[in-house]
């Protein structure tokens, strides 16, 4: 049953838009015996978990409101990466971490008629893994999930800044890269970029002096020049010279 339900989720999601994921994830959860299944996505500052709801859905109860990361079982599941359970009237609610690689996205909230046994928990864990993969894959194709992660307005400079950033966390058996930008709604100028390839990991930090649109433009231009040089196979010194030349002639 689990494999069939997950295969159906993968098939249905192939041509799905970001706003359709909520319904698909819930449908898969029902096929696995859940009453409701809701993905919660963390905001940029990782303070709250916001529910991903189908278009037009209303907050039917407090469980579908934003959840505090530091004060709820859902938040504990997010922080510890371990499933959590709580008894509720007429059933049980399980919280499972949504993780893609090492990127923590949020949690999966699952309402069940009875406490899950080991097999059921294993099935829900597989659903959480599939949901996390879909969230990462579908986010760039719409604003639904992007808006969900924002609790404040991003100005032009910050929007430009975020558009050039790679994923802020990555890990393999050989290397781990992690970064955070603050104040996250007013970033403009500080940029990280990295590349993990066979036998080599390259990490670069850039600081566009000042703070504002001009600083963000400078940082974005610098990253583009850096990637162009790096992907052309230049040495570290030649990359530096190439980026410097691009800045002198291009800005």
Protein language model regions, located:
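Signal-transmission linkers at sensory-effector interfaces
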Residues: 1-15, 137
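Structured interaction and signal-relay segments at domain junctions
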Residues: 13, 21-82
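Flexible loop/coil segments at beta-strand boundaries within sensory signal-transduction domains
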Residues: 45, 98-104, 196-197
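A short, aliphatic-rich beta-strand micro-motif
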Residues: 84-100, 106-108
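Short beta-strand-to-loop transition segments that serve as allosteric relay/switch motifs
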Residues: 106-116, 208-209
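Amphipathic alpha-helical "output/dimerization" segments
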Residues: 116-136, 221-224
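Amphipathic coiled-coil signal-coupling helices
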Residues: 134, 138-145
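… and, occasionally, acidic/histidine-rich disordered N-termini of signaling adaptors
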Residues: 145-251
């Amino acid at each position: 049953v689990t494999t069939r339900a997950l295969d159906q989720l993968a098939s249905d999601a192939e041509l799905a838009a970001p706003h359709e994921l909520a319904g698909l994830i819930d449908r898969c959860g029902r096929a696995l015996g859940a009453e409701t299944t809701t993905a919660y996505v963390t905001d940029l500052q990782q303070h709250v978990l916001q529910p991903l709801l189908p278009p037009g859905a209303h907050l039917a109860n407090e469980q579908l409101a934003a959840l505090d990361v530091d004060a709820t079982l859902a938040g504990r599941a997010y922080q510890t990466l371990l499933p959590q359970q709580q008894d509720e009237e007429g059933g049980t609610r399980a919280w499972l971490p949504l993780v893609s690689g090492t990127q923590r996205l949020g949690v999966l909230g699952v309402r069940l008629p009875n406490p899950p046994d080991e097999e059921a928990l294993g099935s829900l864990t597989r659903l959480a893994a599939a949901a996390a993969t879909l969230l990462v894959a579908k986010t760039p194709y719409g604003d639904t999930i992007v808006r969900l992660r924002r609790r404040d307005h991003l100005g032009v400079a910050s929007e430009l800044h975020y558009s050039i950033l790679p994923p802020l966390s990555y890990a393999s058996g050989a290397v781990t890269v992690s970064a955070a930008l603050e104040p996250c709604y007013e970033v403009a100028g500080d940029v990280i970029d990295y590349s993990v390839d066979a036998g080599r990991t390259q990490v670069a930090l850039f600081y566009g002096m000042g703070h504002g649109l001009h600083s963000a433009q400078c940082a974005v231009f610098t990253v583009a020049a850096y990637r162009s040089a790096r992907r052309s196979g230049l040495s570290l010194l030649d990359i530096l010279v190439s980026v410097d030349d691009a800045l002198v002639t291009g800005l």
